[in-house]
Amino acid sequence: MKVSTFMGHLKELSAQKGCSLATAAKEAKRSGIDYIELDYADTIGHEAEVKALLDNAGLRVGGINTYFDFGHQSQPDLIESALDMAQQLDAALIMAIPGFLEPGDDCSAIREKLAAGLNELCAAASKRGISIAMEDFDGENAPFSRMDEMRWMLDRVPALGCAFDTGNFLFFGEDVLKAYDLVEKRITHVHMKDLAFAPLRGEKGKTSLKRKKLYPAPVGSGELPMAEIVRRLYERGYDGLYAIEHFSAGDQLLFMRRSARWLNNIFR
């Protein structure tokens, strides 16, 4: 199994434990993680430094999360810059967040512009052998986050993959397994985000649209059917990354170790 986690988690771990980022990266590797998800905005201008950090820990780039604003502007320069970074860091995938609604926006019109921007991005990426995926973002201002919205976008952008985030559908009160069935054949990347209804290490949590408090949890220990999701992916022949995600965990090292152990042992 190809397990990854986020550079943001390593930075949180570093701050929590008072250790260097290099030490945090090595802890990830020792935990059974082989890939790291980067953020374009945090990495731009520091590519060589990031590559050296990951190389030293025996880690590779799993993907690059990039925020666009296709609903309000054409962004050819950002498209090319993100693709340049992906090639420089040997990243096979860019996870695109295409843009958000602003007050007064016409949702339907913005959604069409987001689809057009994603089609442009996918066309440019295909020329470089890079894949593009988009996740179900957990924000009310993201008109591509609910399962039907995600399906609509996938239909409008044939080359777009689904970065399936297991936790974000719960934010909208949607059933993750129903969402899975709707997008299964387009899943090219997975964010393994488990959620609990109580904190484990003093986490503040996030309030869902159903007014339910949701807290990050080590993968396999929360309220979501993570084992069933992995089983379905495995039976389908999915061979992509499983990205451990629990931002704002009270103890990132503990969460990371438990999550990686659960994933690496699930088929043993």
Task: Give the predicted meaning of each segment.
Residues 30, 56, 60, 71-162, ...:
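Active-site acidic/histidine proton-transfer and metal-coordination neighborhood
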Residues 12-16, 35-49, 68-77, 102-105, ...:
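Acidic-and-aromatic substrate-binding clefts and catalytic sites of carbohydrate-active enzymes
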Residues 35, 93, 189, 240-241:
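Residues at the N-termini of beta-strands
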Residues 1-92, 119, 126, 161, ...:
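N-terminal pre-domain/capping segments
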Residues 21, 47, 75-82, 111-114, ...:
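Aromatic/hydrophobic pocket-lining residues that form the small-molecule binding cavity
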Residues 55, 59-60, 146-158, 220, ...:
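Short, electropositive alpha-helical surface patch
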Residues 36, 120-223:
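Acidic/histidine-rich catalytic cores of soluble enzymes
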Residues 5-9, 38-42, 63-68, 96-98, ...:
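A cross-domain feature marking catalytic cores of carbohydrate-active enzymes
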